Amino acid sequence: MPLMKFKPTSPGRRSAVRVVTPDLHKGAPHAALVESQSRSGGRNHHGRITVRHVGGGAKQHYRIIDFKRNKLGIPARVERIEYDPNRTAHIALLCYVDGERRYIIAPKGLKAGDQVIAGSDAPIKAGNTLPLRNIPVGTTIHCIELKPGKGAQIARAAGAAVQLVAREGIYATLRLRSGEMRKVPVECCATIGEVGNDEHSLEKLGKAGAKRWRGVRPTVRGAAMNPVDHPHGGGEAKAGQGNPHPVTPWGVPTKGYKTRHNKRTQQFIVRDRRG
């Protein structure tokens, strides 16, 4: 997909870069697979902010995505590729031979008219879903389960890809894009290929307003706050953070400090993403 730049009629247009997607469906989504979603503005049921930098943005309908791919052995035809405002990847509308329609994450190279299938004996082709025990070592995969039958949890964003590097006993070893090596049960399912819309990372919004349209509010530096608001706050004129090590608003070290405390699943990480 080509990239598009604009005439510099304003500072926002001068900096913007967009991905041209002429093959995307121009109409409304499939009505039976759409539901409304309310916005919290980052607040909990007490009205207090629990997630910062969230609020505003354009209204969106949620597209119900089939992350489980549990219609086994039934072929489906790709009707169209659609835009999904809830994720960076595009989605594909499948029509099964029994008439049912479902959305899936669109892998790279998938187009309208292609056929896909899920099952243990499915061919190794982009868009097909198989258990890890039936996928050849070295294959590039995405939409991977962490627990059998729970649905895809890993590698769902635009351009995401994971490589199956080994299989030993009841576990398969995966190399994630971050560099992390992780063990996953071989009964977990994964989809062949990498996620489409891989040029999404080359896009530039161009102006702050484009970020606000997406429901993202500004991020304020701690050093620009008062001491009551942040450990880095206060000082005369443009003072620095003052601390020997940077911390979060709640005093927890940041910028490289490890915060993972889930010992139960630590055994499945063969190599940390930091090396």
From Swiss-Prot:
An MF annotation (GO) of this entry: rRNA binding
A Pfam family reported for this protein in Swiss-Prot or TrEMBL: Ribosomal_L2_C
Ranges annotated as spanning the membrane: none
UniProt entry tagged with the keyword Cell inner membrane: no
Keywords linked to the UniProt accession: Ribonucleoprotein, Ribosomal protein, RNA-binding, rRNA-binding
Cellular component terms (Gene Ontology): large ribosomal subunit
Database matches in Gene3D superfamilies: 2.30.30.30, Nucleic acid-binding proteins, Ribosomal protein L2, domain 3
Region of interest (Disordered), ranges: 28-49, 224-246
GO biological process: cytoplasmic translation
Entry keyword Ribonucleoprotein: yes
NCBIfam families in UniProt: rplB_bact (TIGR01171)
Function: One of the primary rRNA binding proteins. Required for association of the 30S and 50S subunits to form the 70S ribosome, for tRNA binding and peptide bond formation. It has been suggested to have peptidyltransferase activity; this is somewhat controversial. Makes several contacts with the 16S rRNA in the 70S ribosome.
SUBUNIT field: Part of the 50S ribosomal subunit. Forms a bridge to the 30S subunit in the 70S ribosome.
Family as reported in the entry's similarity comment: Belongs to the universal ribosomal protein uL2 family.
Protein name: Large ribosomal subunit protein uL2
Species this protein is from: Stenotrophomonas maltophilia (strain K279a)
